[in-house]
């Protein structure tokens, strides 16, 4: 793409992404620290020598950003790996504890007798597999797709009620629940084609 549609021309997100595409370094060799860039001051670059700082820094940024966000859907953590210290799995776990610690209505996702993750009312979630022809109790028929983000509104005996962005309320059957994952943190791949008010990258 060579025409900017989704972001202001003066945004550092644009200028820095162009540099990346051109194979240019964003910093000088060995530079560490925090710097806000762009005419709009809309990108914070934070570089450090110890990669173990990634997890801590992402958590701190997340805590700060959710204070100002209108919706948890506006704040997105994006990282490259599904497993590991600073991964989708570990960051979703801590983000849930920070954002939605008190919700008691929950549903555990099990695999081989082991809890993989817990879905709670109020959680931000992402659907990971297309599911067609879901019939809601009001008779409406809805499709959901891989990558759809939403908020859990209720958990019933046989379905999870999720308000999906751009779709609305969907009564997702419990049989599909293993494909509903926490969505506070997602991979770069899952984020393709999406847009968010605030992105925390690791």
Task: Name the predicted role of every residue range.
Residues 2-142:
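Conserved helicase motor core of P-loop NTPases
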Residues 93-202:
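Conserved nucleotide-binding/hydrolysis modules and their immediate coupling elements
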Residues 1-2, 172:
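Hydrophobic residues at beta-strand termini and immediately following loops
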């Amino acid at each position: 793409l060579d025409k900017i549609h989704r972001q202001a021309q003066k945004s550092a997100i644009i200028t820095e992404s162009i540099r990346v595409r051109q194979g240019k370094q964003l910093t000088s060799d060995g530079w560490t620290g925090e710097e806000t860039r762009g005419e709009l001051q809309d990108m914070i670059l934070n570089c450090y020598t110890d990669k173990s700082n990634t997890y801590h820094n992402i958590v701190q940024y997340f805590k700060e950003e959710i204070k100002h966000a209108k919706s948890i859907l506006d704040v997105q953590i994006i990282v490259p790996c599904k497993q590991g210290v600073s991964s989708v799995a570990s960051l979703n776990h801590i983000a849930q504890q920070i954002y939605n610690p008190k919700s008691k209505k929950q549903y555990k996702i099990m695999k081989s007798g082991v809890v993989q993750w817990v879905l709670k009312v109020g959680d931000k979630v992402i659907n990971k597999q297309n599911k067609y022809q879901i019939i809601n109790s009001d008779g409406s028929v809805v499709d959901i797709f891989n990558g759809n983000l939403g908020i859990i509104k209720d958990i019933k005996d046989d379905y999870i009620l999720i308000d999906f962005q751009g779709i609305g309320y969907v009564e997702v059957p419990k049989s599909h629940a293993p494909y509903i994952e926490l969505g506070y943190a997602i991979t770069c791949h899952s984020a393709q084609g999406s847009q968010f008010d605030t992105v925390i990258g690791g």
